[in-house]
């Protein structure tokens, strides 16, 4: 992965992002649901979501490809059609899919770039939401439409909605990479500013 000064991705303040007008209902009891998001380098996206209260687990991996298996070396060639993704396990009694999407679009990546994030270029770095059911698809479609109508970005959102077929967990050395390697140049330049942005604007939504 080639580092860049892309950092916090968007220069738009998260304060300019509306809350989703349509969201999944808050669960009455604790539970566990999954969301799979692709927003460039999974190290960076994982680092952001690990901070949020209600997020139970974040696993880096690969989704969206036609090949029967996935590994980092092969996915990086762009030949398998997989994207780097994070699988987020969350408690719907504490945080909603809509909140996860608000963070996805305002902090985790730039959804106006399809097959790149900063200097990371290729279909494996595409912006995508892999929906597990029609409700996840509906929540995502409506929030994208809401952001486009509000002209938050000034250019179209190009995030793809793809049905979730399979999730392949990435190699162990990729998991929790940003926390374990805070001084790595790419992490310092790209992941750390995103985490700082999250803390600045979503302080009341963070783990204590």
Where are these regions (language model features)?
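Flexible coil/turn and secondary-structure edge motifs
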Residues: 1-208
């Amino acid at each position: 992965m080639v580092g860049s000064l892309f950092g916090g991705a968007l220069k738009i303040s998260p304060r300019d992002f509306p809350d989703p007008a349509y969201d999944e209902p808050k669960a009455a009891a604790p539970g566990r649901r999954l969301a799979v998001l692709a927003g460039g380098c999974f190290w960076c996206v994982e680092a952001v979501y690990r901070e949020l209260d209600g997020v139970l687990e974040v696993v880096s991996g690969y989704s969206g490809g036609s090949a029967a298996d996935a590994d980092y070396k092969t996915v990086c060639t762009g030949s398998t059609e997989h994207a780097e993704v994070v699988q987020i396990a969350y408690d719907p009694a504490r945080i909603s899919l809509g909140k996860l999407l608000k963070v996805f679009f305002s902090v985790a990546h730039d959804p106006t770039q399809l097959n790149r994030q900063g200097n990371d270029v290729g279909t494996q770095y595409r912006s995508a939401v892999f929906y597990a059911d029609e409700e996840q698809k509906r929540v995502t479609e409506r929030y994208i439409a809401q952001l486009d109508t509000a002209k938050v970005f000034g250019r179209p959102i190009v995030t793809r909605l793809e049905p979730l077929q399979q999730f392949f967990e990435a190699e162990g050395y990729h998991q929790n990479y940003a926390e374990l390697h805070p001084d790595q140049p790419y992490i310092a330049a790209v992941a750390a500013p995103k985490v700082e942005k999250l803390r600045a604007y979503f302080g009341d939504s963070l783990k204590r």
